[in-house]
Amino acid sequence: MTPDLLTPPKEMDSLSMEGLESAPGGWFDCEVQKAGPAEDGTIFIGLRHTGGAFNCWFSATPTMKREMLATALAALSGRKVVNVYLTSTDEYSVINRMYVVA
């Protein structure tokens, strides 16, 4: 079953990709498409790469989840691009850094 891009997952355990190789991570310029919390407190942020490489959900690193949600909402409401550092470009990977681009 393919996850719905409009709804973050309820359980991260169901997203196990055991045995599959991850896409490389790094720095990317993205548009924030959506952002918000899940029932367990995880913050999910939907990002679309400005170059079209991906358009999917990512989770904010737990130690900075409130700050990342605030940054994502600021970018979303201001229609700004964000520069993010991702562990991988695979869906539901972790966002480690996020900066709004002026």
Spans of features found by a protein language model:
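Exposed beta-strand/loop interface patches that mediate assembly or binding
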Residues: 2-102
